[in-house]
Amino acid sequence: MAAQKKYICAFCARAFTRSEHKQRHERSHTNEKPFHCLHCTSSFVRRDLLQRHCRTVHHTNLNPSTLPSNKSLKNPTTNPLDLSNNEGTTTTTKTGNRKNNSNKNGAKNDKSTNPNPAVSNDDNRSSVGDITTQLPFQVQFNTQLPYQQQQQQQQQQQYPILQNQGIPMKQSFSMESDQHSLTTFDSPTSSLGVSMTPSGSTNSEIVLQQQQQTTKRRKRSQENNSNNNTKLIAKELNHDLVHLLSITKKLTTLLQHYDNVKVNITDSFLIGYVHIQQQAKNFTIFEKILKDLVYYLNTYHINNLQQQNQFPPSQQQNHYTINHFKIGISYCVIALGFLIDHKPNRAIQFFKKSWNLLIKTLIPQYNSNNNLLDQIEILYNLFLLCYIYLQFNLETFDINEKQHEHHSYEQGDEHEDHHQEQVYINNQVILNYLNDISFIIASNLKDVATNNLIDHNLNLFWNIYILLSSYITKEPPKIHQILLNKNLKQNDTLVSLMQKFSKSFINMDMDDEQLKLVVVAALNNELKLYFNDTVDEFEPENSKNKRKFIYDNRNVLHNAIILINKSINFYNPSASLVNDAKMFELKLFELFKKNLIINSPMKYHELFNNYIFIPQHYYHWQLLTLTLKEINQNNVIFNQIHSILTTTTGSNVCFSFIDFENLLKNSFLNYKANPIVINNNLLIISYPIIILSNYLNLDNLMTSMGQMNQLQFINLNIFIIEWYLIMMKVLIIIWDDTLIDFEDNYILQTLMYILLDNKSCLLKRLNIDTSKLEYDVNCERLSFNQKWFWIIKLKFDSIFENWMNFLKNKNNNVTNNSNVTNTSTTGITNTNHNHNDSYLHHFNVNVSNFKFNLNKYLNEYFVTGDFKFREQLDQNDPDQFQGSMSMDEEPDFTTAMQTSQTINSFMPIHNHNSRNQVYQQHNQDTPMTSRRDSTNINENNIAQTSSFISNSNYQGSNSNNMINYNEFQDRNYKRSSSITLGILAQTV
């Protein structure tokens, strides 16, 4: 029997029987040539090619022993680059466990083990990680304490304010791991891995007793130290809370003197402060914003305001020491607290204060005095305003609506809202402000004399870059070209780091969220430059040609996408710092994953192990969306779906969907005119969606959904819809294209494997050895005919429906819990809640309409389409009719369409009479009697369903038809039903 091809290429999924063959093949993707000629500049992929070159060109014979072997070379798709090394050398990993990549001195861990290690005096030349693996425990403990004290002193000197203002400093990942390693040793010799005294020695018992006594004393000492540290942390925390309350009281007095604010802002400021502090992991600039604000409030004296009244009005400005930028930041924090506390009217009031202060006072004031430091302060305020506006989707609120419930305000504040000016703002406006102003300021700071200023505030520009890249869909941020050559990680610029991903995946720090966000943002902008047709009409032609791409061509871009996914989507459940409930769900998912791998053919193991993971953060979903974008390069699909889902006018929805149908029929679904490349990217996006669709009821498994905002939920809905359309196109290719070699395509094989409930159907077709696998002898062989087409299509329908219902419920929960509620604390209805609730209602209705119409159109397209199935039903083949139906009935696709219509029986239907007429005419001209009869039966069923829905669910005859949402509001997303041949046969 031929050897199984279990070694899979990381870029094209081509299979090989030997690992060195796979390694050489992957070099053709990465253009890696590790064998260099010593006589010239030539390099080669294989060693024998170098030997032939030297023999024929230079007339010399190389000694084979001096050349590296294929096994000695590092495989860049298996062994990652370690960013902690300045030289970027590769580091080996063991069976999916990632090595700690950030030692205290920035050096690698030495993985070599020595049975008799000697204590070296050259401690300065080795890292702390090396010391801990070589020295006894007592020496380790004594050598690490001074280092920890020194690092803490350095942190206190660098951040003196943080020790007093309640902003905890996050220790490095290496510090946490090293502290954890101290508690894992049970004896002084456990780190050595050997016994210092032979077991047969007479002194062994004495030594063992001494070791046990020493261990007990050490454990007691560690417990005492741990208790002391806990008490110290609790004492500092109490001090920080008291200090934070004191500066909040000072802020209240400051705002009363500044603009006569008489609202109690203590609770809202604390709520907003804590929220921003929690978000500092994703946007690290928040930590500095809070630190500077607390420092200002801590050092500002209230008596300065009292002394102001002692001077005439002409001199008050010189003695008025209030920092307007910090006032704007304070307004933002207070507005954020009111939003989280379900008081949107109050939040908008303070948001408008901060916006008007920035736009009408601070920016014009900078234009007059031209203070360079004010530019950075402007960006701080504008970034925080933009974050709040987008995160809480304030575009759905009527920000200029006058409040008529004056009694809902506190005494003395009823007329304050009328004095505020109108604010004309939406998502596009605030993004344009941040995009333009950040580019202008960064361009001003690029001068040689002020270049240090932009480098010292580079973290601010990286955070702006992340935010703009996520929400601007058509083009990269204007600061993209400026930041390409700025240092991102140690000595790596953004360009150099991204180019490393085209040749190897990188061992990234699991806690460095900002680095991952920047990498995803850079990849997003690169794809915008490659695939977006729309460019700035005012941009000169010469500058368009000078746009700098990170990757030279699309093949290199494809390699980078594959390796970035492998670097960021790496998942190690044992290293995740999660709570017990989430850890239980993650362990359960790991069991499901291992069960799938163990029971699958060996040649599928590598693909399943690499690509099945849980998207735990929104940037994981962003990366999957970008991976899908490379497959579907037609961005018109994305724009059309976004327009249909976000419109608020019913007539526009119908009109847009008609255009969308034409786009699908004439362009997208025609794989011959618009082909797609079936490669590993298809598996990267499909595995998580298909596998997780069965476990969506495990609430703790998808905790990232609770942290998303409404705009992110919209993008996620579009991603699932676009993936579903891609799967429909792939389904057509598999069943129609005779050039597809399914028996040698591991991508399509594994896709069918995880879809089918009865895996034996696929194994029987591929003639795979099933001696070690669960196998059903009586199963039907998978065939590319009508019946199996509808079986797989219904399976995709079920997965799509589960995900859409799951996202709908999650979006409703997030909106109701984190943004606004029906009533305020005073009992008065929040008027802005109606706007937000109406927006969510329109979105849910649009999604429901779109799902139903899409499913209806696709079923009609597959029945009336001109594509032919690769295989026809063979009446003489017993495998195709074992326990099913006879050829005379042939209602396979009819049953499938009826079942598909039943899935969405509660959805509104889009009536299009002209399409039904064409549909009937096509049936009259079809020579196949069985198809014509079956289609007519299904059409009557559709018509009955349409009349039932229109009578029961629609209210009114206007374009703003409102669906009776209560009928399917509580429908839970269910596990994918088993759509097997037996079930399909029973329905006939």
UniProtKB/Swiss-Prot annotation:
Its main location: nucleus. Keywords: Cell adhesion, Metal-binding, Nucleus, Repeat, Transcription, Transcription regulation, Zinc, Zinc-finger. GO terms for biological process: cell adhesion; positive regulation of cell adhesion involved in single-species biofilm formation; positive regulation of cell-substrate adhesion; regulation of transcription by RNA polymerase II; single-species biofilm formation on inanimate substrate. A zinc finger (C2H2-type) spans 7-29, 35-59. GO terms for molecular function: DNA-binding transcription factor activity, RNA polymerase II-specific; RNA polymerase II cis-regulatory region sequence-specific DNA binding; zinc ion binding. It is found in: Nucleus. Residues 84-106 have a biased composition (Low complexity). The keyword Transcription regulation applies. Disruption phenotype: Decreases cell adherence to silicone substrate. The keyword DNA-binding does not apply. InterPro entries: VerF-like (IPR051059), Znf_C2H2_sf (IPR036236), Znf_C2H2_type (IPR013087). Residues 59-83, 113-129, 174-208 have a biased composition (Polar residues). GO terms for cellular component: chromatin; nucleus. PROSITE patterns: ZINC_FINGER_C2H2_1, ZINC_FINGER_C2H2_2. Residues 59-129, 174-229 are annotated as: Disordered. Transcription factor required for yeast cell adherence to silicone substrate. This is Transcriptional regulator of yeast form adherence 5. It comes from Candida albicans (strain SC5314 / ATCC MYA-2876) (Yeast).
